[in-house]
Amino acid sequence: MHNLIIGETCLLSYQLRRLNITEGKNELFDNMLATIDGVYDLIDDNFNNILNEEYLEFINYMYYPDHNISHPKWINKKYSLDKDNIFSWPVFSFFHYDAFNQDQKDSIIRKTSRFKSKLEDKENVNLFYYYREGKNYNLSKIFEKCNNFKKFISEKYDKNFNIILITKDAGNKNLLYKKIDNIHYFNFTSPYSWVGIDDNWDGHCDNDLFDIFKTEYEKIICNID
């Protein structure tokens, strides 16, 4: 069983590695920003345009508009998608990469090839997606997108894919698990923000909740294909 991250931020990369749910070499989306809309279209295109220079642009992206904070980053315009206006960061960003540095470009190519091979082989796959909170947050729409994505990718590669959706609300610490339709859904509640400008970008203030998440995840993983 492969465990792969498909977005939206590198928070999951930190936490899933800390919990030993993912291990080994970094995968394609571990250090990128992407929406499920962009990932869907990228896979539908068989990854062919991920580094197509026609779509690459170096921009000063406004990551925290409320604080007037921006960062210069490479993006792929073709996959910077928000088809229903529900994402806080509608961008496909090579966040920790310089897409025109040859060594880093080669790294992206290797990661793309490795990621694609795991989709294509015979092992089933767990796909982890963190839906980042924001003013356009729409839980029903993200469930619809996740279900559509699961159907699409399972049919494309003719094997089973499980979607593990993670969201975060403000409040007293709690972790809720539900299976809704075909999606394994974990909702974290905590007084600590995961989207602020402080250093809690990796959710480390809620490591205790992620430890509980691992226990619950291991229970359900025994019962899914």
Task: Write out the residue ranges for each language-model feature.
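Extracellular glycan-modifying ectodomains
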Residues: M1-D225
